[in-house]
Amino acid sequence: MTDKGPEPFATNIEVATLANTAFRDTLWTGKYLQLTVMSIPPGGVVGGEIHDDHDQFIRVESGKAKVVMGPRKDDITFDETVGDDWIALIPAGKFHNIINVGDDDLKLYSLYGPAEHLPGTRHETFADAAADPQETDLV
């Protein structure tokens, strides 16, 4: 899907999230907010990262995931298994990762405030995201 921001936009987020097959696809980028959808294969990860100046909201539409957070990668203080219709709120400055612990693709959407990725960012795979020089928050 093409990034529709910063113009006004409405969509059925469940349909858009479940239809997405890319690791990450940016649906909308505004001045202070960004919406992405993700599809993570079984055993795959979003990737450990820290957003120093971004809060993040994640909702799982389908699948089973382990959400870990903490001050640092080697100091995990939050570990929760989540599934369909669960959310995770990630404060700025927290290390976090999401691991698909289910047997099917994990389908989720994420809201960043402010925007985390360049408008129109699309990564077909985790490897594509890891190789993108614009993705500097992975740790």
Predicted regions and their residues:
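Short hydrophobic/aromatic-rich beta-strand segments that constitute the beta-sheet cores
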Residues: L35, V67-M69, L108
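Conserved hydrophobic/aromatic beta-strand scaffold that supports enzyme active sites
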Residues: T26, L35-S39, F57, D79, ...
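A short, N-terminal "cap"/entry segment at the start of jelly-roll beta-barrel domains
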Residues: M1-Q34, G47, E80-D84, H123-V139
